[in-house]
């Protein structure tokens, strides 16, 4: 059996941050300006794997219940991937090194999803069996329905994606983290109109979206579907799901996330409020 290092080098040669959905240039798949996450942090982080020559990392996700994972719809759609073609890897410090892949029972994509730019970029994966919760594996807390995340809220995004636009995460593929500043939706919308011929009356950043990041810290291609979590009164709440953006850590182009609080009613049509 090849050593983990040999396997990692072989994977790197074929590792391209590809999502099964179109429009990849706008999808987020990496962490810019971050550092390796401590092994004891982010116990809800998961890696989504797509069947191929090997189970390839395509997106991030978050454990929100012992049997449910939250991710972006563009990771599994718009034509829903068969559950048999997807596996979930729970919190892993280095991709591919200690895989224990979990089968998926069903995939639920939001019915209003078409493209990330049009919103509703959210999906749920039901695992075949509930996982054992421990200090290393824990669901993240969803925010209350009226929870807002104003500028200045301490928020972090995590993932295994690109470290710069077009620069894949190198071996040993560590989980990365970066603190990102929240950008108010109105300001984010103004920034995204800069340099575009789109009229000011056309809303780019919609009410079901949330913006975070700047030219020094951002999510990138590979991080798609992963969690944006914010510390509120001592509790980590999942504010967003990594969705889309223009480039990575570009001026006036914050990362755009699906606003989790906006979709709580939809989430709880499937996911019990209590484990």
From Swiss-Prot:
Its primary localisation, in coarse terms, equals: secreted
Glycans attached where? 132
* Self-association state and partner proteins as the record states: Homotetramer.
Q: Which Enzyme Commission numbers does its entry carry? A: 3.4.21.59
Which protein, by its recorded name, is this? Tryptase
The SS bond pairs are 59-75, 155-230, 188-211, 220-248
Provide the Peptidase S1 domain boundaries.
31-272
* Protein source organism: Canis lupus familiaris (Dog)
Q: For this protein, what reaction is catalysed?
A: Preferential cleavage: Arg-|-Xaa, Lys-|-Xaa, but with more restricted specificity than trypsin
